[in-house]
């Protein structure tokens, strides 16, 4: 139903990809036509930011229902879109508050040991999306969330990949993950840096 946009995993991710692409290429796009940016931003507001505030999707959490990586993965992507393209401070604040609540629900599901119950591959859509969420919230609030990096649970979430690393490209495998989880990126390094864990 085009009159009631649904934010699911890939709607949120597509929104974030478009938000970042247009932000990075805005000068080049404006040289072609100023209408490109306007159309993309209009769609981002209609399909992502407005329904995010107006609706409650299951992955946002309610403090009772169990959450999974959708919660923080979608939250990260909606926040990225808002951080880049929402100019109204009141709307931006409302999105931030709702996102922070979802992040709390997500964290409540994590054990104190920081283990990702979906395995090392999904950690990138769980623990690392939490890292991105904190970074975006810090960017939107002049680093109001920086103290989170000193919380033991957050530090343990950051250390998860190094704790389950077996050797070379192999990780201790469980759930529906492969033993070869793929190459690490800058996010693992930066999460380690923020939590002061040199082994990362």
Regions found by a protein language model. Give the residues of each.
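Carbohydrate-active enzyme catalytic cores, enriched for enzymes
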Residues: 127-200
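Active-site lining segments of carbohydrate-active enzymes
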Residues: 2-121
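Amphipathic alpha-helical protein-interaction segments enriched in hydrophobic
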Residues: 120-128
């Amino acid at each position: 139903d085009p009159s009631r946009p649904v934010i699911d995993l890939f709607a949120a991710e597509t929104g974030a990809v478009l938000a970042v692409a247009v932000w990075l290429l805005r000068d080049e796009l404006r040289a072609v036509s100023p209408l490109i940016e306007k159309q993309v931003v209009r769609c981002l507001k209609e399909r992502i930011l407005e329904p995010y505030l107006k609706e409650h999707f299951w992955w946002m959490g309610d403090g009772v229902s169990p959450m999974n990586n959708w919660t923080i993965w979608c939250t990260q992507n909606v926040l990225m879109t808002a951080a880049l393209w929402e100019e109204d401070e009141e709307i931006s604040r409302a999105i931030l508050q709702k996102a922070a609540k979802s992040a709390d629900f997500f964290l409540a599901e994590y054990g104190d040991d920081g283990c990702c119950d979906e395995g090392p591959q999904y950690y990138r859509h769980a623990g690392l999306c939490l890292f991105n969420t904190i970074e975006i919230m810090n960017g939107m609030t002049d680093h109001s969330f920086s103290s989170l990096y000193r919380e033991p649970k957050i530090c343990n979430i950051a250390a998860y990949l190094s704790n389950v690393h077996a050797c070379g490209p192999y990780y201790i495998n469980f759930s529906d993950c492969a033993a070869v989880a793929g190459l690490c990126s800058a996010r693992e390094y930066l999460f380690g840096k923020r939590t002061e864990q040199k082994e990362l």
